[in-house]
Amino acid sequence: MNLLEKVEQDTMPARYKHMTSQEMIARVTEIKAQLGEDLFIPCHHYQKDEVVPFADAIGDSLQLAQIAANNKKAKHIVFCGVHFMAETADMLTTNEQIVTLPDMRAGCSMADMADIHQLTNAWPKLQHLFGDTILPVTYINSTAAIKSFVGEHGGTTVTSSNATKIVSWALQQKERIFFLPDQHLGRNTAFELGIPLEHMAIWNPIKNELEYDGNLDDCKVILWKGYCSVHQHFTVKNIENIRKNHPNMRIIVHPECTHEVVSLADDSGSTKKIVTEISNAAPGTEWAVGTEANLVGRIIQENPDKKIVSLNPFMCPCMTMNRIDLPHLLWTLEAIQNGEQRNQIKVDEHTTKFALKALERMLQLS
């Protein structure tokens, strides 16, 4: 297959864009019924409302990883999420199960901030500075190659749901941890566990150097200089505005927000925690939510008895997380129905071998 043929194969035909929503909903419903248990559609909380109704499971990264690991029936897993999630699903399922991503452009800018070549350059420098005292810990929002490196070096993956438990375990294994790619989740979790900010360093992958003014012996956490482009846009000013204009409103944010924002919020937690906390709250309560716009909108719809707003009123959905839509889902399902293979996510055996070590450590500890 030449490059032009590859591009044509990976490009959704224009006819899907001209179908009505009703036509697409009917076709997706029909194909799901025909395929039955051979098809499984996991969907992350951040996905568009137009695809969520077709999900067989909705959850955060930890929930979806656990669900993928336990699903042995489905021949086809069509992941409504992003690339790193589909990679994780492929590694946790059997070789006979096929994982596809409806739109290959669906990604995570934070995961892309940690490149495997940057990590392999960083590791010997950190070993030179600290010796064999570092355990690597990677957020599940990372590439399979990053997970594999971490697993090969005795480390583990982590999600926002289990971060406190996993980081606590990691700090018992070695004197310090190297947390990547999200500096904010790493900082917020370590601080919650009692590690002072002055004992945390930054690793700058662009300059390939450590940013730290303190005594190296005091450094307990090394944070990769990465972040979520969505959660970094929630600010202290946003919180001040809520406190001023809505003094009875409770503020809950995702721990990918900056330390300043998390410290000033009333609570923080994973998407699962945010959904559960608000769902279980008393009618009439007021909430400002600091996370992705699609999820905030869905929480508002599902809780009409409460007043809920986005912490940042100008927040947009994550543009890379937001790629998968109804036309791409239908395109993928029709390919499966016709016996065609499109947009398969397949991680090579060597990468899978060590990445699984990191993932399985996390799942066992969770």
From Swiss-Prot:
Which keywords has UniProt assigned to this entry? 4Fe-4S, Cytoplasm, Iron, Iron-sulfur, Metal-binding, Pyridine nucleotide biosynthesis, Transferase
Molecular function (GO) terms for this protein are: 4 iron, 4 sulfur cluster binding; metal ion binding; quinolinate synthetase A activity
Cofactor(s) the protein needs: [4Fe-4S] cluster
**EC code:** 2.5.1.72
User: Where would one find coiled-coil regions in this protein?
Assistant: none
* Pfam (any one): NadA
**Where in the cell?**
Cytoplasm
* Pathway involvement of the protein, from the record: Cofactor biosynthesis; NAD(+) biosynthesis; quinolinate from iminoaspartate: step 1/1
Instruction: State the source organism's domain of life.
Output: Bacteria
Q: How is its cofactor bound, per UniProt?
A: Binds 1 [4Fe-4S] cluster per subunit.
Single biological process term from Gene Ontology: 'de novo' NAD biosynthetic process from L-aspartate
Residues that coordinate or bind iminosuccinate: H44, S61, Y139, I140, N141, S160, H254, P255, E256, T271
Catalyzed chemical reaction(s): iminosuccinate + dihydroxyacetone phosphate = quinolinate + phosphate + 2 H2O + H(+)
Please list the residues that bind [4Fe-4S] cluster.
Answer: C108, C228, C318
Q: Which InterPro entries match?
A: NadA (IPR003473), NadA_sf (IPR036094), Quinolinate_synth_A_type3 (IPR023515)
Example GO CC term: the record gives: cytosol
Family the UniProt entry places it in: Belongs to the quinolinate synthase family. Type 3 subfamily.
Task: Report the function annotation for this chain.
Answer: Catalyzes the condensation of iminoaspartate with dihydroxyacetone phosphate to form quinolinate.
Which HAMAP family does the UniProt entry name for this protein? NadA_type3
What is this protein called in UniProt?
A: Quinolinate synthase
Q: Which organism is it from?
A: Listeria innocua serovar 6a (strain ATCC BAA-680 / CLIP 11262)
- Lineage, broadest ranks: Bacteria, Bacillati, Bacillota, Bacilli, Bacillales
Q: Which gene encodes it?
A: nadA
